[in-house]
Amino acid sequence: MARKAHITVGVGCDFLGDAAFGCPYSEATLELERLCVAGYTPMEVITMATKVNARLLQMEDQLGTLETGKLADVLLVDGKPDEDIRVLRRSDHVKLVIQDGRIVKNAMPHTAKA
């Protein structure tokens, strides 16, 4: 409905899950998946979660896109979330996380140096 009415939609979830009840951290990605089920493309949903959210927060000069001078948290996944958003749900697909300029997860395969 929001899409047909050209309403700007951001992404956000206060519930990150509770492992004690079988809800992993990836529960937050459920919203992304539901937006795809509602008719948005995976790339539209990724844009909502990044660029659109920055605009809604009036912080697009600081966040939302990877550009020189902007703050950046970076997520590198094994898969193509722009084609299948579900790859973001699986922690084993998350290979590299950079937060506030620091690597907080590095599951990249290491290659030997010649």
Task: Describe the role of every protein-language-model region.
Residues 55, 68-113:
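C-terminal cap of metal-dependent C-N hydrolases
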Residues 1-80:
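His/Asp/Glu-enriched, well-ordered alpha-helical/loop segment
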